Structures are given as structure tokens and as C-alpha cells.
Amino acid sequence: MPCGGYFSVDSLRGVLVLVVDSHPRGRETLREILSYCGALVTPTASVDEAAGVMRQVKPDVLIVALPEGDDVAFIRDVRSLKPEEGGVVPAIAIARDADDDLARSRGYQASLRTPLDPWELCRLVSSLMTVR
């Protein structure tokens, strides 16, 4: 993956990102992009797997690429957690028809459309970290 001229490839160093994507290729692509920018990525394939990870580790950012309905129920469950359990973790929804207003109304901080721009993803994760 080439270096993006305006974005340092280690700018996400130490950021813990939990990825929830039911598609193996999507999960791997997200892992590669975020790892390239320095993030520590835990990819999961399901809501149940992600919930199990969140009971053990509190991610800095949550990225959700699930079919509509599954993602809504999952983020609702996350938002019902206490802050110390991860209930306030910044979250990004990824979908073909992503809409920021709709995503925010569901409990996400932002959304990204597919196909993804790798640098846009890394910049968005970085911006969510500076807001915290």
C-alpha cells in the first residue's frame, strides 16, 4: 500500500481498534489498512464475537460493517453499556449507502461509504481519537 502524502503511516500507533465485519475480505482489508497506519486491530466476524472481545478489552475505536439491522442492534447494545465497559467508544459505520446523519441517529459518530478510501478511514479514526 503506497504512502499517502498527507497522512503519517504511524499516526494510529497504539490505537486499539475493534473491527466487526461479517465478510472475511472486508475484515482483512480493514485490518490491513488500519495496521499499516499503526493501529492495533482486533478483527471479529460477528456481534457475539465482538461483544466477547469488549468484555475483555476496551477498544479506542469501534468499526462496524454489518448488514443493516445487525449493526443497529449491536450499536444499541454497545451504547447501553456503562462508560467504563465501553459504552462511549467512538464508532464508525461502514456501508455501501452510508449516511452520516442516519449513522449518528443510531449511535455512531461517523460513517464511511464503500469502496473505502484507506487514507480517509485512517484520518477519520485519528480525528475520533483527538475528540476524546
Model-derived features with residue positions:
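Short beta-strand/turn micro-motifs composed of small residues
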Residues: V19-D21, V64, A93-A95
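Conserved phosphotransfer microenvironments
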Residues: I63-K82
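Alpha4 helix (beta4-alpha4-beta5 surface) of REC/receiver domains from two-component response regulators
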Residues: A73, A93-T114, R123
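Acidic, metal-coordinating helix/loop segments flanking the phosphotransfer/catalytic sites
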Residues: A45-V61, E68-G69
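Non-catalytic signal-transmission and effector/linker regions of two-component phosphorelay proteins
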Residues: M1-P24, R31, C37, D48, ...
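Conserved phosphotransfer cores of two-component systems
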Residues: R55-V57, D77-V88, R106
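Short acidic, S/G/P-rich loop/turn micro-motifs used as interaction or catalytic elements
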Residues: H23-G26, A65-D71, A98-D100, P118
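Short beta-strand element of Class I
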Residues: V41
